[in-house]
């Protein structure tokens, strides 16, 4: 479980929770909840819940089902089913008529799982560009993750050796993507994303990791 404090244009704006677990040896599940609070909650009310289920083979992950509930947007519900046998993604909005998207390859996932796969690489080299095949809404494309030189980063949980990366994705429902998403992963086998910076619909958002439980007996909480 990862817990984040979110700042919007420099002021406290909300919280985010992310959980990755394996209910069975060959199955993974990711759960995300993002909620805006305070002034940000007034100007940009947000309560999104995302659930992803997929197949797991070691570090290889394949999304099979994705759903997103946008509570503050009149309960807008998005569902995607990845039919891996046919190589297509079936998408439905608000339980309406399903729409078959373009053909997708076996390595294509939605953005969250795609980033989990990219960060699980055994080694990162400064200057390296990693391709990220994604389907995002109606878009099917190859994003990029650019690796930057290692550095030290002070966080609410203390100081970490980190690997900064820039993630280049196309515009989506949440991200404006006028610039790349910046992520700082811990430089260890956990690759914890301790800080994330991105553009959103109205302004700039930063998320700092304030608590984690990696499921291996390591946990820390700054609260």
Residue locations for each model-derived region?
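Acidic, serine/threonine-rich low-complexity disordered tracts
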Residues: 1-84, 121-223
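Hydrophobic, well-structured mid-protein blocks that either form specific transmembrane helices
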Residues: 77-121
